[in-house]
Every structure is written in C-alpha cells, then in structure tokens.
C-alpha cells in the first residue's frame, strides 16, 4: 500500500503530461514506441487505461490490479531497454561500418596508388628486359668476333704488308721507267745503226757502179765519145735530177716507214717481255 501511495503522485503528473501533449507529439511517441510493429503500442495503451482506472479507484481497491500494472510496466520497461540496447547496437554498428567504409576508401586509394606504381614498375621492367635482350644479343655478336688486341695486331701486320707492297711498287715503277728509257735509247741506237748500214750499202753500190763506168771509158774514147773524169761522175751522182727526186725519195721514205713499223713492233714485244719479267719478280718477292 505504501508503494501505491508513493506512485500515486507520479501517476498524477504523468496523466497531466499526457493531457497536455497534443496529437502530433502523441503520434511521434507512438511511432517511437511501436517501431517494429510488435504490439508495444497496444500494450502501452492497455497499461495506460488500467493505470487511469487504478488511479481513479479508491485506495482500498484490489491489489491484484496493482500487481498487473507492475507486470505490464516491467514488460514495457524491458521492451524499452531492449529498444535502447538495439539503438546503441545500431549506432555502434553504424560507427563500425563508417570506420570500415573509411578504411576501405583508404585501402582503395592505397590500392590505386600501388596499381599506378606497379604500372610504372611494369614499364620499367619491360624496358629493362628489352635492354637485357639487346645486351645479350650484342654480347653474343661481340663474343663471336675476335679479340680487340688480336685484331689490332692483324691490322698492323696488314698495314706493314701494304706499306712494303707500296714501296716495292714504287721501286718496280722506277725500275720499269728506267728500263723503258734504256729500251727506247737502245731502239733509237739500233735504228741509227740500221740507217748507217743502209747508207754504207748504198755508198758501196754507188762505188761499184762508178768502177764499172771507169772500165768502160777507154772504149768510149776510142769510139769518139767525150771522156768524163771521176770527179764529174761523182758530181753527177751527187746532183739530183728530177727523175731521181721523183723515184729515189719515195723509195727511201718507204724504207724508213717500214723500219719504223718494224722498230715499233720490236719495241712493243721487248717491252711486254720486260713487263712480264718484272711482274714475275714482284710475285716472287711478295711470296718471299
């Protein structure tokens, strides 16, 4: 009964607050209470009706009504505590999911940065692989080539051989020029000797003809023909006539032309033989 007396002033205050609440606030409270639609609103309405009935009754009413009110109030309180715990749990889960979202966003940003860096590393790795393949190819080609020092020695040897051959060529050219000059001089001398021999043979022939004329002069004197001295005969032979000019000079010119042709043929033959001999000497020197 003491508990009933203690709750009565509070009940009067609650009733006064409920009367003062307007319809909108009542609807908000009902929506907040009956959030999941499990009958909390009906339970509160029943509790409120019983409470108002119990408050309007006298103090000597049945205590069973009070126990029933306390039981329903405990159920409503338990439901409210459950709702509060649910709200706290939902808020905690919401904070947790918010943190997870932020964490995943940071992870996504880091993953994008890692992807970009991986792309750059991939490009660098491709370039390195390409350079390595080119290096291996060049290294294999260089490995197939002879050593630099050996190649340099071989080049120096070839240069010395080329210099020696150039010197030999110059010597052979000077030698060839000298022999050519000697050969030209020799052919000129031979030609001069041939001309002298031709002149000697012609002079001997003229002297023999003059001897024959001298032997026939006594017979001519006996027959009354003018005597001609040897000096007149020599003068006649030395003085050319128009017939001698017409017949003798072309004949001499043809002889000199034939001699020059023969001389050129012989000169070419001897020159070819000399060149062949010089080439043979050069081949022998190079082989040695």
UniProtKB/Swiss-Prot annotation:
Residues 201-210 have a biased composition (Low complexity). It is found in: Cytoplasm; Nucleus; Nucleus speckle. Residues 196-265 are annotated as: Disordered. Residues 244-261 have a biased composition (Basic and acidic residues). InterPro entries: THOC7/Mft1. The keyword Nucleus applies. One of its GO terms (cellular component) is cytoplasm. The modification Phosphoserine is found at residues 216, 229, 256, 260. Residues 219-235 have a biased composition (Acidic residues). It comes from the Eukaryota. Keywords: Coiled coil, Cytoplasm, Nucleus, Phosphoprotein. Its main location: cytoplasm. GO terms for biological process: mRNA export from nucleus; mRNA export from nucleus in response to heat stress; mRNA processing. Disulfide bonds: none annotated. Residues 95-178 form a coiled coil. Pfam families: THOC7. Belongs to the THOC7 family. The THO complex is required for cell proliferation and for proper export of heat-shock mRNAs under heat stress. Part of the THO complex containing HPR1, THOC2, THOC5, THOC6 and THOC7. PANTHER family: MAINTENANCE OF KILLER 16 MAK16 PROTEIN-RELATED, THO COMPLEX SUBUNIT 7 HOMOLOG. This is THO complex protein 7.
């Amino acid at each position: 009964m003491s508990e009933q007396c203690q709750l009565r002033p509070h009940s009067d205050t609650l009733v006064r607050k409920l009367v003062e609440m307007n319809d909108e606030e009542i609807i908000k409270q009902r929506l907040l209470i009956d959030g999941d639609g499990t009958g909390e609103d009906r339970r509160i309405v029943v509790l409120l009706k019983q409470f108002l009935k119990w408050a309007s009754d006298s103090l000597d009413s049945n205590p069973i009504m009070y126990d029933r009110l306390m039981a329903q109030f405990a159920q409503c309180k338990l439901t409210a505590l459950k709702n509060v715990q649910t709200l706290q749990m939902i808020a905690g889960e919401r904070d947790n999911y918010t943190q997870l979202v932020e964490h995943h966003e940071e992870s996504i940003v880091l993953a994008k940065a890692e992807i970009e860096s991986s792309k750059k590393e991939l490009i660098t790795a491709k370039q390195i692989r390409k350079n390595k393949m080119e290096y291996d190819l060049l290294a294999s080609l260089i490995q197939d080539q002879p050593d630099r020092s050996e190649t340099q020695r071989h080049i120096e040897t070839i240069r010395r051989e080329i210099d020696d051959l150039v010197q030999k060529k110059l010597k052979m050219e000077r030698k060839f020029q000298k022999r050519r000059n000697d050969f030209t001089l020799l052919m000129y001398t031979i030609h001069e000797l041939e001309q002298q021999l031709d002149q000697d043979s012609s002079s001997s022939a003229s002297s023999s003809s003059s001897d024959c004329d001298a032997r026939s002069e006594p017979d001519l004197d006996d027959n009354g023909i003018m005597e001609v001295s040897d000096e007149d005969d020599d003068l006649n032979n030395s003085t050319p006539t128009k017939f001698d000019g017409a017949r003798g000079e072309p004949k001499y010119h043809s002889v000199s032309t034939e001699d020059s042709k023969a001389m050129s043929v012989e000169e070419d033959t001897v020159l070819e033989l000399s060149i062949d001999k010089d080439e043979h000497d050069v081949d022998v020197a190079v082989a040695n």
